[in-house]
Amino acid sequence: MTPEILPIDQYDAQLEEKTGRLGAMMAPFDAPAPAVFRSPVSHYRMRAEFRIWHDGDDLYHIMFDQQTKQRIRVDQFPAASELINRLMPVLLNALRAEPVLRRKLFQLDYLSTLSGEIAVSLLYHKALDDEWRQRARELCDELRAQGFALQLIGRATKTKICLDRDYVDECLPVAGRQMIYRQVENSFTQPNAMMNIQMLEWALSVTQGSTGDLLELYCGNGNFSLALARNFERVLATEIAKPSVAAAQYNIAANQIDNVQIIRMAAEEFTQAMNGVRQFNRLQGIDLAGYRCETIFVDPPRSGLDDGTAKLVQAYPRILYISCNPETLCANLETLSQTHRISQLALFDQFPYTHHMECGVLLEKRQ
C-alpha cells in the first residue's frame, strides 16, 4: 500500500482478518459474534494532513513512509474524499503562483464533508501579516468562483487567521433523519463519514426501547449524544474542549433538539461531582440528582477509561462503549465484566487497510 495506490482487491481479506482478531480478543469475555460494518473501499477519509515539500519555486504534498521515513510525493490520495482529491491539485497550482502564500508553508490540513463544504488550514514557519491575509482572501475567492465551498485558515506560532470561519457544517442521514453537525478545524471529528453513519445507526438500534436518561462522557461536538437523544427522555453530556462544546451547543439548536444538556468538564471532574467529592460552579442550576441515567455512553481516547471512570461507569445498568483501541477496551473489560456482560458487539472498519480497529460493545448489568 502506498499513499497513491490502495490494495482494493485485498479489502475483504483484511476485514476478515480484523473480524477474527476482534473475536479472539473478545472470547475471554463471552462476547457474541460481532456485527461487521464495511467501509467504502476508497475515498472514505474526510480529513487529510500533508507536509509540503519545496523544490525551488515548485512545491507538492508529501507523506513519510512509516518504516523508512522516506518522503513520498502525493498528487492524489484515494483514501481521502473525492472533494479533497479535486481540491489538492487546484490549490497547489494557485499556491505555486503566489510567493507570499507559498513561502515557509510547511503543512496543509484538509477537512471535508459529505455536504460539500471543505476547510483547509495552511501552517507556516513565519509570521502572518496583512499582505498574507489579502493574498489568502484573493485565493479563497478564486477557488470559490471555481465551485469550491471553501474556508481558508492560516496558522503560525501563536497565530490563527480565520478569513471567514473556522468550521464546516456536515449533514448526515441517520436512521431517517438529516443530522447537522458543525465541525471545527483542528478539533476531533470522525474521519470516516460513511462509517460514522453506520456507528450512529448501530448505537440507535441497540438502545431502542431504552428507559430513563443517557449520560455521555467525552461527547465532542455531540456526534453521538444528538443522534441518540431520540431514544432517551434526556441526555446529559460532558466535554472538556471549548471549541467542541461550542459546536455541540450549535448542533443542539440546528437539529432542534430540546432534551440534551452539555456541561464543560473532564470525565474525572464529573466523576468527583457525581460522587459528591467536589462541587463545581459550572454545575450551578443543573440538578444532577434529578437525572435518572440508566445508560452511560463512553467513546474514550485511545488510552481507554481511567480507573476512576471505569468504576463510575459500573454503577449504570447499561454501558455503551465505542473504542478506537480494542486493547485498552479489553483492559477496561477486565473490570467492567465483573459486573456486566457483553450483549452486543460490533466491528466498524473505520481505517481500512491498516491494523487499527474501531469497535462497539453494549454491556448490561449481570442479574
From Swiss-Prot:
Coiled coil: none annotated. GO terms for cellular component: cytosol. S-adenosyl-L-methionine binds at Q190, Y218, N223, E239, D299. It is an enzyme of class 2 (transferase). One of its GO terms (molecular function) is tRNA binding. The keyword Nuclease does not apply. It comes from the Bacteria. One of its GO terms (biological process) is tRNA methylation. Its EC number is 2.1.1.-, 2.1.1.35. CDD domains: AdoMet_MTases (cd02440). The active site is at C324 (nucleophile), E358 (proton acceptor). Keywords: Methyltransferase, S-adenosyl-L-methionine, Transferase, tRNA processing. It catalyses: uridine(54) in tRNA + S-adenosyl-L-methionine = 5-methyluridine(54) in tRNA + S-adenosyl-L-homocysteine + H(+); uridine(341) in tmRNA + S-adenosyl-L-methionine = 5-methyluridine(341) in tmRNA + S-adenosyl-L-homocysteine + H(+). Belongs to the class I-like SAM-binding methyltransferase superfamily. RNA M5U methyltransferase family. TrmA subfamily. Dual-specificity methyltransferase that catalyzes the formation of 5-methyluridine at position 54 (m5U54) in all tRNAs, and that of position 341 (m5U341) in tmRNA (transfer-mRNA). This is tRNA/tmRNA (uracil-C(5))-methyltransferase. The lineage of its organism: Bacteria, Pseudomonadati, Pseudomonadota, Gammaproteobacteria, Enterobacterales.
